[in-house]
Amino acid sequence: MASTLISSLAVVLPLTLLAPSMSMKISRIDVLGYICNNGTVSNEEAYRRSYQINLDAIRGDMRHVKFGTHEHGDPPERMYVLSQCVSDLSSDECSLCWSRATDLLSQCFPATGGWFHLDGCFVRADNYSFYQEPVSHQDTKICASDKEKSAEFKGLVKEVTKSIVEAAPYSRGFSVAKMGIRDLTVYGLGVCWRTLNDELCKLCLADGALSVTSCLPSKEGFALNAGCYLRYSNYTFYNERGLLAMSFTKENLTYIFVISMVGVLAIAAGFWCGKCFYMRTSPKKKIKGTKTKKFHLFGHLRIEKESESICTESHLMSFEYSTLKKATNNFNESCKLGVGGYGEVFKGTLSDGREIAIKRLHVSGKKPRDEIHNEIDVISRCQHKNLVRLLGCCFTNMNSFIVYEFLANTSLDHILFNPEKKKELDWKKRRTIILGTAEGLEYLHETCKIIHRDIKASNILLDLKYKPKISDFGLAKFYPEGGKDIPASSLSPSSIAGTLGYMAPEYISKGRLSNKIDAYSFGVLVLEITSGFRNNKFRSDNSLETLVTQVWKCFASNKMEEMIDKDMGEDTDKQEMKRVMQIGLLCTQESPQLRPTMSKVIQMVSSTDIVLPTPTKPPFLHDSM
């Protein structure tokens, strides 16, 4: 049965048809990526009928305006469909691309829907109104296998994508760019679905720009987002003839519009000249106390426009304060998710229904200023499925705001250390959290060369499926190539920061900073997840006891099972849990050289074939034990 071909797929499958020829030029009707939803409908026949009715309703629009939306059916199985062609395609090319995409999407059913990204068009169907979604956790990127490692090429790609991000939202959601230097030329194209407003379009393309620039030094990069598509290449892939036709049509319309408005403008000009003459001959009143609009930002006097560059330079959306105020009902206490060292985190709902998390920071002095700059700088450079997505920022004279994606299950500590909620976390979910956090840290250490410095349960956010995302990069530091330690002499005592109970001993006592301090914090987190106890609030007869030392004692006396969280039930794989606890102990060894890298941790958690070494004593354990 055709419907079983690709049903029940919950992950993006990029370039299924294209992957073998990624080094070759691709066709505009080649499939770049697709997804079929996990959920299924109860009445497949009726759902397919709704799909066909929706397609029939937008067929004419696709040929004439290359875009269409329609919905049909009764909730909860009402179907919503959106499809759009890239503007440079001709009507015939659009029809061909759309026909192929819709045929392929029909194979998803009885899933509740899915989407197909072709190079020249996009189609999506689902059982809810998704039209205002700019980004999604299912967004993906594709990077070509061919490389161009010159610095000039990288610079051109960044300039081309930046140009598209800035131009497309104000050009009906579509823009192309071309830049060259000597024998190198980069071509780019960006398109937003027409249901997005300018702000959401820019947000989507900015996110796409981050994705494709992380492909470098690949010669081609593709960003497949929920609300847009962005591509760069080293050859002309778009239809220049189609662009000329678009330009000709626009010029004709502009000419007609200008001619028709000349009379109106002439009359308006007459009124304006009269007003200017009156103002020049009238007595002038001096208004006292007027000044250029400036404000204090991070303890420094800056012009408002300059503050916005902090966002725009990182390809981030600059949110209006009024938008965030409305989204949180004037930062109502009922919207507050938590409180941190420099402010609070609120849940917000934008006018299109999209939920966001807003970190409001009360800034005064250099330290919080540096942390805000640092957080924006770090997270805007890094993109991974296990790192929280930064959407944008906002600055006022009193506060600064960082806007993130909202994750429904908030932070791990809210669930893990709650006697009732922790029962939601079976071993499968906890293992997923441990592995996902390790993968996020591996990406930070190996790809971004970043040390997080504050890994703990409250900085691990969970989505609806309990998949983890590392957050709060205010203390993160870049470290040298090769993973060498940052010299302690370069760190002032005040710059040694983190959370007691999670900080590695060599960092506390000597200021030695390497990626092994994250390994230590991760090890503490692993022991918390497997035991259900909080490390710095662990209770025992010995007031100096910590969770880490207690687990090590149980390991040494072959009583590890006593430390396993009983709330996971009797069906838990005790052997696997004890193995993961041992990995936690390996990460919390006193000697940083003995702690495994995150790559090794992932291997040890994923494969039981790897024999684990015996962990040495953790720090702060008295020899009298």
UniProtKB/Swiss-Prot annotation:
Modified residues (Phosphoserine): 458
Any one Pfam family match given in the protein's UniProt record, by short name: Stress-antifung
Family that this chain belongs to: Belongs to the protein kinase superfamily. Ser/Thr protein kinase family. CRK subfamily.
Phosphothreonine carried by residues: 499
SMART domains reported in the protein's UniProt record: S_TKc (SM00220)
Residue ranges constituting the Gnk2-homologous domain according to the UniProt record: 29-130, 135-237
InterPro entries, per the entry: CR_Ser/Thr_kinase, GNK2, GNK2_sf, Kinase-like_dom_sf, Prot_kinase_dom, Protein_kinase_ATP_BS, Ser/Thr_kinase_AS
Subcellular location: Membrane
Gene3D superfamilies xref list: Gnk2 domain, C-X8-C-X2-C motif, Phosphorylase Kinase, domain 1, Transferase(Phosphotransferase) domain 1
In-chain residues carrying the UniProt-annotated modification Phosphotyrosine: 404, 507
Name the UniProt record assigns to this protein: Cysteine-rich receptor-like protein kinase 46
